[in-house]
Amino acid sequence: MKHLIVAVVLLSALAICTSAEEEQVNVPFRPEERIGECAGWNDNCDKRSCCDQCHQCRCKFGSNCRCTGTKPSCGKR
């Protein structure tokens, strides 16, 4: 009987630990989005293909770049 109780406790602990683990997601990068060219939040991505000359590019370390906002030199569109 003790072995059955221990087995149930161990299986329950295994189930809880397995469900608590976070899923790892691999983010696909285009060549111009690799970490060396895009580390941290910045607005200096003018030469990147993800934005045009009037939009700011923001890249978070380990994520794809996002084009947000309009540069002051372009005014409102």
Swiss-Prot record:
GO terms for molecular function: calcium channel regulator activity; sodium channel regulator activity; toxin activity. Residues 1-20 form the signal peptide. It comes from the Eukaryota. Residues 21-34 form a propeptide. Keywords: Amidation, Calcium channel impairing toxin, Disulfide bond, Ion channel impairing toxin, Knottin, Lipoprotein, Neurotoxin, Palmitate, Presynaptic neurotoxin, Secreted, Signal, Toxin, Voltage-gated sodium channel impairing toxin. Expressed by the venom gland. One of its GO terms (cellular component) is host cell presynaptic membrane. A lipid is attached at S73 (O-palmitoyl serine). It is found in: Secreted. Disulfide bonds join C38-C51, C45-C57, C50-C67, C54-C74, C59-C65. The modification Cysteine amide is found at C74. Negative results: has no significant effect on voltage-gated potassium current in Drosophila giant neurons. Excitatory toxin that acts on both calcium and sodium (Nav) channels. It preferentially blocks a subset of calcium channels that is apparently not required for neurotransmitter release, it decreases threshold for sodium channel activation and it slows sodium channel inactivation. As it enhances synaptic transmission by prolonging presynaptic release of neurotransmitter, its effects on sodium and calcium channels may act synergistically to sustain the terminal excitability. Belongs to the neurotoxin 02 (plectoxin) family. 01 (Tx3) subfamily. The presence of a 'disulfide through disulfide knot' structurally defines this protein as a knottin. This is Delta/omega-plectoxin-Pt1a. The lineage of its organism: Eukaryota, Metazoa, Ecdysozoa, Arthropoda, Chelicerata.
